[in-house]
Regions:
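Small-molecule kinase domains that catalyze NTP-dependent phosphoryl transfer to phosphate-bearing small molecules
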Residues: 6-9, 94, 116-183
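Conserved lysine of the Walker
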Residues: 13
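Hydrophobic anchor at the beta1->P-loop junction of P-loop NTPases
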Residues: 5, 110
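Extreme N-terminal starter segment of soluble prokaryotic enzymes
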Residues: 1-3
């Protein structure tokens, strides 16, 4: 099963992804990870080329105020610069190649879809799309946060209550998806 997660900053995308990795044996990928590696290479933040993608998250190197600036830089470099230079689907293509090269797991989750072209790219590859709605999301004006409002996913789940409630909603959806996947 291949899942594509859509949601604004703070909606619960990583929470959902981490839960599916632990409970349902999914392998997680993120389009934004490659933006982080690109920035890392360009700025020499990390010097150890043997660092595993899952061992360190570059944004953890920054304090809260710097993280806000870092997010803005990621958006500017990943969207405003690289997509213009290399094409809109550059991060989709790189992530897709990583999935094909590095994963034998048939349960794949991409947990950071933000644009219509990303959605369309992975829908063509039979990904099931899930949008997370959360009333407490941070309001941001970058296209990566606004354009996703136009995406009509296969499923919508809400994350407005406790973490336990969110897990119950995820379990309910997974039961439905697994049952449908078997038929």
């Amino acid at each position: 099963m291949k899942l594509l997660i859509i949601g604004k900053a703070g909606s619960g995308k990583s929470t959902l992804s981490n839960y599916l990795v632990k409970k349902y044996n999914f392998k997680q990928f993120a389009l934004g990870d490659n933006v982080k590696y690109f920035i890392s290479d360009m700025t020499n933040i990390l010097h150890n080329i043997d660092t595993n993608i899952n061992e360190i998250k570059i944004e953890e190197l920054f304090d809260v105020e710097t993280k806000k600036k870092y997010r803005k830089h990621m958006q500017q470099i990943g969207t405003d610069l690289c997509q213009k230079w290399f094409g809109k689907t550059v991060w989709c293509e790189i992530t897709n190649k990583q999935i094909k090269t590095n994963s034998t797991n048939s349960n794949i989750i991409i947990d950071d879809c933000r644009f219509i072209h990303e959605y369309e790219y992975f829908k063509k590859q039979n990904y099931i799309s899930i949008k997370i709605l959360n009333n407490r999301c941070l309001l941001m004006n970058h296209s990566s946060e606004l354009e996703q409002d136009l995406i009509e996913p296969d499923y919508i789940i809400e994350n407005n209550n406790s973490i336990e409630d969110f897990y119950n909603i995820i379990d309910y959806l997974m039961t439905k998806l697994l049952k449908h996947n078997l038929n």
